[in-house]
């Protein structure tokens, strides 16, 4: 119980701006905040590298059971749509896990899209993430098309993808 309370306080701290004022909420239609963070190999990755492509940001942690369960759904969607340019970035909020441990964990789940690291929660703070899993769907133009808090099934993910995937015609 104390651990959960401490984690909640940490999330509160990460999601407040100067002098403890809450950050502005992220909303659909808004430009997605750019960020730079590292992958599990130490390479720096910026959201702007994916401008022009549909992007799914999934905030998760190895200790989050619903996050782990959702990974197979996200992998199935990625496999089905990666040839159409879909990018999924799994942003790990694990502060206590090493990059190697995060990589091993996501590999054990059968995930092939890249895990990124956000151990201090700075990327999560830009996106006002305070519950896991949370997923942001970003249109190729760089705007937020949809947001989902909590685990998703395949139908839910596919419903949100309609707003960001190129239309076949």
Language model region names:
Residues 1-31, 169:
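N-terminal targeting signals for export/organelle localization
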Residues 40, 50, 140:
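Short, ordered coil/turn segments that flank beta-strands lining enzyme active or ligand-binding pockets
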Residues 45-68:
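Short active-site neighborhood of thiol/selenol oxidoreductases, capturing the structured segment around
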Residues 51-53, 83, 111-112, 129:
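Active-site acidic short loop of glycosyltransferases
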Residues 56-58, 90-92, 137:
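Hydrophobic beta-strand core positions in alpha/beta domains
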Residues 68-109, 119-126:
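Structural microenvironment flanking redox-active thiols in thiol-disulfide oxidoreductases
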């Amino acid at each position: 119980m104390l651990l959960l309370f401490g984690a909640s306080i940490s999330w509160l701290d990460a999601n407040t701006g100067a002098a403890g004022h809450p950050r502005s909420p992220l909303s659909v239609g808004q430009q997605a905040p750019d960020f730079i963070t590292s992958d599990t190999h130490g390479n720096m990755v910026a959201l702007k590298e994916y401008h022009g492509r549909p992007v799914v940001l999934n905030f998760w942690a190895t200790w989050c059971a619903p996050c782990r369960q959702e990974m197979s759904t996200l992998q199935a969607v990625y496999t089905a749509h990666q040839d159409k340019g879909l990018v999924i970035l799994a942003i790990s909020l694990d502060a206590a896990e090493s990059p190697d441990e995060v990589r091993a964990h996501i590999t054990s789940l059968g995930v092939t899209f890249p895990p990124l690291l956000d151990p201090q929660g700075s990327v999560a703070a830009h996106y006002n993430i305070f519950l896991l899993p949370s997923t942001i769907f970003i249109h190729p133009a760089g705007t937020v098309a949809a947001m989902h808090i909590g685990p998703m099934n395949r139908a839910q993910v596919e419903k949100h993808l309609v707003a960001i995937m190129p239309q076949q015609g």
